[in-house]
Structure formats: C-alpha cells, structure tokens
C-alpha cells in the first residue's frame, strides 16, 4: 500500500508541473493573441482603403479593365495557397483547414495535374508531401507577428505563377479568426481579381484625369493589390493560430487540474485504507495477547 501511495504522490507532483507549464503557455498565447488582433485590425483598415482605391480606379472608365489579373480564363489548373502552423499544440487548427482542402480537391479534381499546392507552414507542407502531393513552394518559420517582408517570397511567387499561367486561378486556404474560441476554415478565391462579388460601388475617381493612363497604373497596382489581400489572409490565419493555441493550453490546464483532483481523492482513499488496515492489525495483535 505504501508503494501505491508513493506512486500516486509522484503522479500528482508530475501533473502539477505539467499544469504549470500549460498555464504559462496559455498566458503566452493570450499575449500573442492580443498583439495579433491589434495587428489584424490595423491591417483591415489599410486593406479597406487599398480596396476602395483599386475599385475606384478599375471603375473609372466605362470600358472594362483589360488587365490579365482580372480576366477569367479557362481553368486547366488550380493553385492552392494553404496556411498552417509550423508546430502543434494548437488543437484542431491544422486538421480543420487540411481536411477542408483535401475534401475540396477530391470534389473538384480527378488527377494531380489539375492542381498545385503552395504551403505556408511546416505542418501543411509535411502533410501534403507525406501523401505524395506536389508542393511547388514551401515557406516555414514564420514569426508570431509576421511582416510582409517575411511572406513576400511566397506571396510574390503565387502572383507570379498566376501571371505566368502556371495555374489559372488561386485559392487561399486558411482559418479565419472569429473570436478566441471560434475559427472557421475558409477557401477564398484571390485570382483572378474580381470586385463584383463584394458589392463595391461605382468609383469616385471617374472625375479625375489619370496619368499616364488607367491600364498602365493597373499593371502596377493589381499585383500589389493581390499581394496585400493574400497577406491579409496570412495575418488573419496567424491570429486564429494564437487563439487556437491559447484555447488548447487552457483545455490542457483544466484537464490537468481535473486529474490532480481525481488523484488527490484516490490518494486520500488509499491513505485511509492504509490507516484502517494498520489499526485492524494492531487490534488483532492486542486481542491475540
């Protein structure tokens, strides 16, 4: 019985240490989440302004824009930019988006020549490579608060591959941050660029004279616009990742406390049984005398 009590005490001590670690990780994730939410909010304000300016410019002439990034072409191949984390301990964050991507690929494509993957995050890259799915570009090691410079390579790669007609449409697949407890898997079509589905209003720039001309400006602006929208999805996904990490660590901490309570009850019962047995043995010994 003594050994059993020692084992229980060891388990309690070990679980307490684990709960301290997960509790600390929860606090770290909460701090990262707060910063990420502020970053995402600030970028959203910027993105809305960029979108308004671009929409105004596109709509500043009765003639439709002829820029290749806005022209729908026959879809022979689809590009998927899949955003995941580099590590675990984020609950169902990675599995949610990866399941969504795989399900969509199976519905839309009959063979691997019809799509390609660009992976932002080691978990996604390893997931697809383990299943022999071609990954044309991988970016790992993103910081907790990613700057555009960090993701410029993969964002530019996605836009350039589309411009080179290596694929005919691009979807960005990521977890959208709703709140600290909820995120939702999204697959947003980024290319070709379309403003119709957003319900944008007629441009205010129609009364302005453009220099050198609208098409020349759009040739420079639209790739940058697409890159900024993709970057916005990355910022959103990173916020959802921190929220998932905080929730996962909170759950782990709560579970540890529950285990500690159960072990404490088990320890008290075992100790009571041990004392009762000792008293019984003493009484039995005294009776024998």
Swiss-Prot record:
InterPro entries in alphabetical order: ATP_synth_F1_ATPase_gsu (IPR035968), ATP_synth_F1_gsu (IPR000131), ATP_synth_F1_gsu_CS (IPR023632)
SUPFAM superfamilies: ATP synthase (F1-ATPase), gamma subunit
Superkingdom as given in the UniProt entry: Bacteria
Pfam families registered for this protein in UniProt: ATP-synt (PF00231)
Any one of the GO BP annotations: proton motive force-driven plasma membrane ATP synthesis
A GO CC term attached to the entry: plasma membrane
Predominant cellular place of this UniProt entry's protein: membrane
Transmembrane segments: none
Tagged with keyword Phosphoprotein: no
Keyword Disulfide bond in record: no
GO molecular function, one term: proton-transporting ATP synthase activity, rotational mechanism
Topology within the bilayer: Peripheral membrane protein
Subcellular location: Cell membrane
Keywords in alphabetical order: ATP synthesis, Cell membrane, CF(1), Hydrogen ion transport, Ion transport, Membrane, Transport
Stored NCBIfam families: ATPsyn_F1gamma, PRK05621.2-1
Subunit field text: F-type ATPases have 2 components, CF(1) - the catalytic core - and CF(0) - the membrane proton channel. CF(1) has five subunits: alpha(3), beta(3), gamma(1), delta(1), epsilon(1). CF(0) has three main subunits: a, b and c.
Function: Produces ATP from ADP in the presence of a proton gradient across the membrane. The gamma chain is believed to be important in regulating ATPase activity and the flow of protons through the CF(0) complex.
Recorded family membership: Belongs to the ATPase gamma chain family.
Name of the featured protein: ATP synthase gamma chain
Organism: Lactococcus lactis subsp. cremoris (strain SK11)
Lineage, opening ranks: Bacteria, Bacillati, Bacillota, Bacilli, Lactobacillales
